Amino acid sequence: MARDKRAVSGWLVLDKPYGMTSTQAVGKLRWLYSAEKAGHAGTLDPLATGLLPIALGEATKTVPFVQGGGKRYRFTLEWGSATATDDREGEVVARSDVRPSEAQLRAALPAFTGTIEQRPPAFSAIKVAGERASDLARAGETVALAPRPVTISELVLLRHTPESSDFEMACEKGTYVRALARDLAEALGTRGHVTALRRTAVAGFTEADAILLETLEASTDRDRLLRPVATALRHLPELRLGPEEAALLRNGNPVLLRGRDAPIEIADAWASCNGQVVAIGSVHAGHFRPSRVLRA
């Protein structure tokens, strides 16, 4: 028997377990909370564990503001073999006896920091003629995705042996760890693939914010584990308005901002009333214009 849906809203940072897809994780939380709506702020591969921010209810309207934030990963690269998926889930497609030294590896890392061109893995969610590249690849089609610019702000070697190395990486949206591992190995004259991957931070959330699925399932008061909708907007200017102005915004109307310090122009901001998010929008000519309105 289907559960009755309820108007629950907020953010939860799930510590996604190994083997679960991001879509499955969203479905699980939506069921646990009987939420009307749910969505995640950035796909995490089934192979990966770690931070997967999930929005419930009205928080789904704030997903883009988390999705675009920076991310941090720890991963293990195994030397000597390439796979079809660039991780340990795929079949081996090439081998090499070459093993880089630690000195060679450290010398290669600077070329993979900053803004670089990266070719996404064939097994990815990128759309090709309306279909996911991964679906085409599984169907046996050759998928050649064009390189695209990505930004890697930090790439640190944590441990090195002849057979595998551990790294920590900070990057921006659109960066594929699997592609980095593939390209780094090829630059060192060998082959490689990712055998372990963990997202440790995303858009200001850290591992201290993460909640295990087992903890969530066992909780008798799950709502207290939710973070406010405004959590996703904490990096944007907040405009505190009164009830009358909030009512105008909820009907989709702009409001004139009053007061000596009222802003004239802001690209992205959010309006609140009594601590609750009313709308997300921008300020032009001293008027706040809503682009997304949230239910009370």
Enumerate the predicted regions with their spans.
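Accessory RNA 3′-end/elbow-binding domains used by RNA modification enzymes
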Residues: M1-H40, L44, A48, G69, ...
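Pseudouridine synthase
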Residues: A125, R132, A137, S164-G204
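Residue-level signal for inorganic ion chemistry
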Residues: I54, F75, G130, L180, ...
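Helix-hairpin-helix/helix-loop-helix acidic hairpins
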Residues: P149-E163
